[in-house]
From Swiss-Prot:
Enzyme Commission number, as recorded: 3.2.1.21
Native source species: Aspergillus fumigatus (strain CBS 144.89 / FGSC A1163 / CEA10)
Record-linked InterPro entries: Cellulose_deg_GH3, Fn3-like, Glyco_hydro_3_AS, Glyco_hydro_3_C, Glyco_hydro_3_C_sf, Glyco_hydro_3_N, Glyco_hydro_3_N_sf, Glycoside_hydrolase_SF
Compartments, as annotated in UniProt: Secreted
UniProt name for this protein: Probable beta-glucosidase I
Pathway linked to the protein: Glycan metabolism; cellulose degradation
Annotated catalytic residues: 225
SUPFAM superfamilies documented for this protein: (Trans)glycosidases, Beta-D-glucan exohydrolase, C-terminal domain
Lineage start: Eukaryota, Fungi, Dikarya, Ascomycota, Pezizomycotina
Gene designation per UniProt: bglI
Length: 838
């Protein structure tokens, strides 16, 4: 790669070459113009790790804690380090652009991708995202803020019209993007799938050009979300530089014709191409060649950072009687469906093949010096557990053979064209390629051998984007090839799981074969659903057992145990891109299991893994409760570090946890109805709503305990004289002394809130405006400083003036942290002023 003379290159490009540059060539790569030294660039998903170019059978990668977990750290320095490692992982995968971070706003607990965004509050989300992007882009890799804007649900996400006031748009949904840009102007922004107030964002000139480019002064590249381009002229004229993925649906000859007929002017094309060429120059110093090989890092220092991030994200919600930390020398009973499952990431674009994973059970067992026993407690799978890791190949390897043919199984003498060895029995083939496969229609036989450990009836399940028949010892057990029903897996492309059963004997080996046909072999009506390539498959199995049997056994064991910890929650099956949750509840049986174990042993520690809030009807019984999110590669070790006191928890909730779904402010206005969703809660998202209506959530935004105690004192506040025009340069500086009054070293998160004066405008009771994190030894005191610009601390969006308004009056400053202590001060705004810009 070489630095391009952008203006000279634009002059030398033909119209056809310009058109080609504005669309991808495949799922992950941009177009090249070799004669002008313009190379193809590679992009890769990056919500919580850099997957590389393959969903299917890809090169393993580091998996970071999910964004809500990172949001819970409230730690800008950690987010910077995470960003740097993300950049280094991207370089290892030969990718110039990371498609992240996501900074949408969780207006509902049910959003399928809620775990991908940092927080319900724009200040917390935007500041963390800015430091993350700063770390990432300092490696030379381009970051992509997404999804711009109001992509806050999965239901009908390609078509839904988000009806939102401009005030809510500015104060809630655009704010994290605005604040992130103040810290780091990212090289790229990705548009949202949805419409906003009647127009798809990818062709919304007000959002892309007027706000992002003109008002904020941003000059990077705007790309579509994958298949999120819906027009030729409208999108190119609105400011959408790049349609992804390729091959193009809307550009190509259609765009060339539009330019020749003056429906899109060539000077507009030049602007689109200019932004694309500027991106080339941004990433050129990386020296990553076209189609670079994908490598793994997995360095010890990276593992240490991932473990620290996992541990520092764990929120201590309750700790009555100082049950935690646990005693390493005492025996421990581990219970629950998440104990031996590594719930390390959510589903969809966030999913990847991690270098390794550590389950909570493994994390506890590695640190306990006493006996560690296990009880399942309940099964919480949405679909039957993957069978692949329990299979063996005919030559004794873990997993199964994946044999590819162009002809169906009914064809005699068909030719084997590819054979792979796989362990995971879940595969999305969107990026599978082979030179002998010319179309999306082909067939795969997956064959392995299963030896059950227990007698019993075993249930088998098959989910496909395509068709599938599962045989056990040549007996058809599951037929998912006819009368198929659409489900939610694989971005909403897959069928529901079809099941069958067979009685098996312990110790006997059975041959298991899945005959799979790709997506075109299915008779499922897929109108309105984007088909990603040739389809996908998933097959699982489990011994049939009653939940009552499992719960009773767990409760009995708990009644006799000296230390008990439950690991329950959700997984990537329940929280994933492609669909929203129907409710906030844990999977069936989990609440009853937790409640009965707590009755049997009230000192049981409960650990919940989820990316977003869940209901906890047993919370009043639990003395010790942790929220542990999806913790990445090191989730099990990170949780165990907190349980045993190696790490003193300091995390605070980045989301409000309502008592029940009906309490959340978007309850009446979530999901698409007749093609639209009304953002009826307006600016009252999350804590802004609960505080305004004086409705206590189960656990509030910003909540989190510690193994030590802190005090805050000596609050001082300094302002600067007001200028005629309100702009940057009028900082409010808040200084406070923080003391560790306990006996354990630990970190405190100091939160700065501002409460507005009473005016004629309805405003939140208070809003977060700044925060900092400080580590203190027992008895140590440190002064900390939080600085926030007056315009950001005081303003609301005036829809009549179409400007931010900082109104005259007395503003109260509140400083909070761990515990109930609140320090207060105030400052004056002497006259009302208005402003625009970043």
């Amino acid at each position: 790669m070489v630095q391009l003379d952008v203006e000279k290159t634009i002059e030398e490009l033909t119209l056809g070459e310009k058109v080609a540059l504005t669309a991808g060539i495949d799922f992950w790569h941009t177009a090249a113009v070799p004669r002008l030294n313009i190379p193809s660039l590679r992009m890769s998903d990056g919500p919580n790790g850099v997957r590389g170019t393959r969903f299917f059978n890809g090169v393993p990668a580091a998996c970071f804690p999910c964004a809500t977990a990172l949001g819970a750290t409230w730690d800008t320095k950690l987010l910077y380090e995470v960003g740097r490692l993300m950049g280094e992982e991207s370089i290892a995968k030969g990718a110039h652009v990371v498609l992240g971070p996501t900074i949408n706003t969780q207006r509902s607990p049910l959003g399928g991708r809620g775990f991908e965004s940092f927080a319900e509050d724009g200040v917390l989300s935007g500041i963390l995202a800015g430091h993350y992007c700063k770390g990432l882009q300092e490696t030379g890799v381009a970051a992509t803020l997404k999804h711009f804007v109001c992509n806050d649900q999965e239901h009908e996400r390609l078509a839904v019209d988000s009806i939102v006031t401009m005030r809510a748009m500015r104060e809630i949904y655009l704010l994290p993007f605005q604040l992130a840009m103040r810290i780091c102007k990212t090289a790229c922004v990705m548009t949202a799938y949805n419409k906003v107030n009647g127009t798809h964002v990818s062709e919304n000139k007000q959002i892309i050009t007027d706000i992002l480019r003109k008002e904020w002064g941003w000059d990077g590249l705007v790309m579509s979300d994958w298949f999120g381009t819906y027009s030729t002229c409208d999108a190119i004229n609105a400011g959408l530089d790049l349609e992804m993925p390729g091959p193009t649906r809307w550009r190509g000859t259609a765009l060339a014709h539009a330019v020749s007929s003056n429906k899109a002017f060539e000077f507009v094309m030049d602007e689109r191409v200019r932004n694309i060429l500027n991106l080339h120059n941004f990433v050129e110093p990386l020296g990553i060649p076209e189609n670079a090989p994908e490598k793994a890092l997995n360095r010890p220092e990276d593992q240490a950072l991932l473990r620290r991030a996992a541990a520092e994200s764990v929120v201590l919600m309750k700790n009555q009687d100082n049950i935690l930390p646990l005693k390493k020398e005492k025996p421990i009973l581990v219970i629950g469906p998440n104990a031996k499952t590594a719930a390390y990431c959510g589903g969809g674009s966030a999913s990847l093949d991690a270098y390794y994973t550590v389950t909570p059970f493994e994390g506890v067992a590695a640190q306990s010096q006493g006996e560690v026993t296990f009880s399942q407690g309940v099964y919480s799978y949405k679909e039957l557990p993957l069978l692949g890791p329990l299979l063996k190949t005919d030559d004794g390897k873990k997993g199964f053979k994946f044999r590819v043919y162009n002809e169906p199984p009914s064809e005699p003498n068909r030719q084997l064209i590819d054979e792979l060895h796989l362990e995971s029995s879940s595969g999305f083939l969107m990026d599978y390629k082979h030179p002998k496969i010319k179309t999306f229609t082909f067939y795969v036989d997956m064959e392995g051998y299963f030896t059950p450990e227990e007698d019993g009836i075993y249930d088998f399940g098959v989910t496909v984007v395509g068709t599938g028949k599962l045989f056990v010892d040549d007996e058809l057990v599951v037929d998912n090839s006819k009368n198929q029903r659409q489900g939610t897996a694989m971005f909403g492309n897959a069928t529901v799981e079809e099941k069958g059963s067979k009685e098996l004997k312990a110790g006997q080996t059975y041959k298991v074969v899945l005959q799979f046909g790709t997506a075109p072999t299915s008779d499922l009506d897929m109108r309105g659903v984007v088909i990603f390539g040739p389809g996908g498959f998933r097959f699982g199995a489990a011994r049939r057992v009653s939940q009552e049997e499992l719960i009773s056994k767990a409760a009995e064991l708990a009644s006799q145990a000296s230390q008990v910890v439950i690991f329950a929650g959700l997984t990537s099956e329940w929280e994933t891109e492609g669909y929203d949750r129907d409710h906030m509840d844990l999977p069936p049986g989990s609440d009853e299991m937790i409640s009965r174990v707590l009755d049997a042993n009230p000192d049981t520690v409960v650990v919940i893994q989820s990316g977003t809030p869940v209901t906890m009807p047993w919370a009043h019984k639990a003395k010790a409760l942790l929220q542990a999110w999806f913790g990445g590669n090191e989730c099990g070790n990170g949780i165990a570090d907190v349980l045993y006191g190696n790490v003193n928890p300091a995390a605070k909730l980045p989301l409000s946890f309502p008592v029940r779904l009906q309490d959340n402010p978007s309850y009446l206005n979530f999901r698409s109805e007749r093609g639209r969703v009304l953002y009826g809660e307006d600016i009252y998202v999350g804590y802004r709503y609960y505080e305004k209506v004086d409705l206590a959530p189960l656990f509030p935004f910003g909540h989190g305990l510690s193994y030590t105690t802190f005090s805050r004192s000596d609050l001082s506040l300094a302002t600067t004289p007001e200028k005629p025009q309100l702009e940057d340069g009028e900082p409010i500086t808040v200084t406070v002394s923080v003391t560790n009054t306990g006996s354990v070293a630990g970190a405190e998160i100091v939160q700065l809130w501002v409460a507005p004066p009473p005016t004629g405008v309805n405003r939140p009771v208070r809003e977060l405006k700044g925060f900092t994190k400080v580590f203190l030894q027992p008895g140590e005191t440190k002064k900390v400083e939080i600085v926030v610009e007056k315009k950001l601390a005081t303003s609301w969006w005036d829809e009549q003036r179409e400007k931010w308004a900082s109104e005259k009056g007395t503003y109260e400053v509140l400083v909070t942290g761990t515990g109930d202590e609140v320090l207060k001060s105030s400052f004056e705004v002497e006259k009302t002023r208005y402003w625009l810009g970043l």
